[in-house]
Amino acid sequence: MYKNQLQELAQRSCFNLPSYTCIREGPDHAPRFKATVNFNGEIFESPQYCSTLRQAEHSAAEVALNALSNRGPSHSLAARILDETGVYKNLLQEIAQRVGAPLPRYTTFRSGLGHQPVFTGTVELAGITFTGDPAKNKKQAEKNAAMAAWSSLKQLAKETSSSMPEPENIDELEQVIIARALINYRIKENIGTGSSSSAPVPFAKKFFMQNLRPTSPQPSPATTSRILPFICPKQPSRSSRSSLAATSGIDRIMAAALESRSYQRPQQRFANPPYVPMRQFRSQCHGMAPPVTIRTAVPVFSAPPMPPPPCTNNTQLPSSVYVPSLMRTAPPVRIAPPVTIRTAVPVFASAPPVRIRTAVKPTVEAGETRISSVQEKESIPVLPDSLEIGVEGSTITITDCEKTASKETERAEFKDSSKGEPETARERLENLKI
């Protein structure tokens, strides 16, 4: 039981597990054992010899727990570990079974404000009532009552053993000694006999008991370690003491200087002020905020800004007129190209009407040459009606106009035939529609 509590305490404190060493004495038929436990480098020894090895180890673990719980830094931790596992309730139940009394009965009373209740617990054991310290909840109040009952019974057992002339057997368990002391106390106080009433009697004796678990644990000082609560607080060295004293002296001088400066007379304000470090007057603002820059946004499709009027020799812009940089360097505005509309003709649409031109064929008579208007536009040179070529022995007359007229006639017929092709295609489409 005590070994388990000591092991749990070591695990919560981030220490190595406790190690036990046993010493055996006496003959083989009646051996005696004495154990020592090493807890975080400290050695705790059982106060007496025990008949079994297990009892000796439990006795050494109990000594270690009692020693650790009595120390200042570890006071609340050891007591809390013993409380959370319900050790004291189990011990009281075992004492009640040894005495032959009914099991312990716990009662809690609530007091205080509604949002901050206070619970006080009492436990009745063998007709005796024990009252514990107040707590913030019922469960802790019952544990405090069991703790107070166990501490009172231990003190009663020590007082009884010291008053008895005959020495007791040192091999007996602590529970047996406490049960015997409780029986003697009941007989002495006439508790549970026919002459006394059946109502429970409060425990009359008052013993000096250490508060194994304070109701409101105080925070440990800054010099102690939270991880290693069993290390005693170190005493400050001489150098640290001198530095602390110097710091406190400087603080007092600073306070006095500030007070004298604030309450000095008006005629003494212009005297030399006392020296005060600048860190005392350090402002909260560590720097100036950057200036705010406002940018003017020009829409994309807006009209370009008006250019400034041209400066002549006589007229100049005043120096006070400010032209923004965006207006000075305005981007060029591009104008979209004109829209061109093209007429699309469907494939199966009817062909557009064709303008028919009638060409006038030239009429050539004998001895004359007539040229149409088309021939006149082409400005073809006109040859004389007849040419006389003199040849030896004979004269030959050639009429070139006849040749030219025949050529022009052939050209006109070729044009008429080419212009008549669309007309035949149109006639074909009309025939298909019909």
UniProtKB/Swiss-Prot annotation:
Q: Which InterPro entries does the protein's record reference?
A: AtDRB-like_DSRM_1, AtDRB-like_DSRM_2, dsRBD_dom
- Supply the alphabetized keyword list: Cytoplasm, Repeat, RNA-binding, RNA-mediated gene silencing
Domain DRBM, first and last residues per copy: 1-70, 87-155
How is this protein organized at the quaternary level?
Heterodimer with DRB1 or DRB5. Interacts with DCL1 and DCL5.
What GO molecular functions are on record for this protein? double-stranded RNA binding
Gene Ontology annotations of biological process type: miRNA processing
- UniProt function note: Binds double-stranded RNA. May be involved in RNA-mediated silencing.
Keyword RNA-binding found: yes
Question: Could you tell me which Pfam families the record lists for this protein?
Answer: dsrm
One GO cellular component assignment for this chain's record is: cytoplasm
Q: Where does the record place the region Disordered? A: 402-434
Instruction: Report what the protein is called.
Output: Double-stranded RNA-binding protein 2
Annotated knockout phenotype: Flat, serrated, blue-green and ovoid leaves.
Q: Which PANTHER family match?
A: DOUBLE-STRANDED RNA-BINDING PROTEIN 2, PTHR46031
Location in the cell reads: Cytoplasm
- Which CDD domains does UniProt cross-reference here? DSRM_AtDRB-like_rpt1 (cd19907), DSRM_AtDRB-like_rpt2 (cd19908)
Task: Report if keyword RNA-binding is assigned.
Answer: yes
